[in-house]
Amino acid sequence: MHVTREPASFHGGKVTTLEASPAGVVLNATGSAIPLLTFRNFSLRCDKSDPKVSFQTPWNWDVIQGKKIAVITSNSYLRYQLIVGLAGLVPPVSGNFFGDCVISWPVAGEGGLDGRLRISHGLDFLSTVYNDCIEQSKVSLDEFWELLSGMEIYPNLIIKELSGSQKDFFFLALSVLFAFDFYLIPKTKYLMSKAAKPLRMLLLRQLEDKSLISTSTNNRFLREFCTDGLVLGSQGEILFSGGLSESLEWADRNLEQSKTSESDENLFEVDLKLTNLDASSDVNDDF
């Protein structure tokens, strides 16, 4: 997804570690750095059962290049909505986000590929759409194909005919191959598995000067991949922002039920209502 910067009078602030207000809320401060992504009056749906419940206070802040942000919240539906919202799969309830960057599809997701395509045809399609991201990639096609062959995944195979473990490996490898400016990482159970270790190393290489937002609840992943934390209340209110360790500690002390299970990642495997409108049909969430 390519997000193009548009003219705006908004001069939001970058999210940094700041002094807390008397209520314990970390405030935003203005910054001179050029933002990679700007949220302006941005609000998402927060309650699966009630489409009228959205952000208590709309977001007006920037993500600065190089920030790797772990979103920490006890609201699993909000985590889900944030990823699909930034991926462009659902519209925000209000406001928008913009920036001069290319946002990934959710890492380890299917990238919109039809399962009837052959592996080579799927790669050709995405390489055409994300041509710049292939040209700037720190992962070579030779590395990509070599890793796939180790899992007996070959160019002429049809995607839907891969085994479950082959699909997991293929879709993660595909996400790692492209050099996006901004990565969305919701699921990390497979990424942090032994089988995915070679891909994990390549993703770290690809992310060296990039930005990401992750809604993972895997602390090992967060400590390995993220630099900053953003603690959210159940209605999207920013309760705390700062370094990853202090954000995790703050959430453990103050956020009710902040220690969540990776079973939350199943939200990305089943049919959920992706829309923020009340009267629309379900969409199959295969990314």
Predicted segments, located by residue:
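ABC ATPase nucleotide-binding domain signature region
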Residues: 38, 65-131
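Glycine-rich phosphate-binding loops of nucleotide-dependent enzymes
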Residues: 38, 44-62, 68-74, 83-86, ...
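A short, flexible loop at the N-terminus of ABC-type nucleotide-binding domains that lies
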Residues: 2-6, 10-62, 70
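Conserved catalytic loops of ABC-family nucleotide-binding domains
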Residues: 195, 202-218
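Conserved H-loop
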Residues: 217-225
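ABC-family P-loop ATPase nucleotide-binding domains
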Residues: 45-49, 101-197, 201-203
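Conserved catalytic segment of ABC-fold P-loop ATPases
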Residues: 224-232
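Conserved beta-strand-loop-alpha-helix hinge in the C-terminal portion
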Residues: 232-275
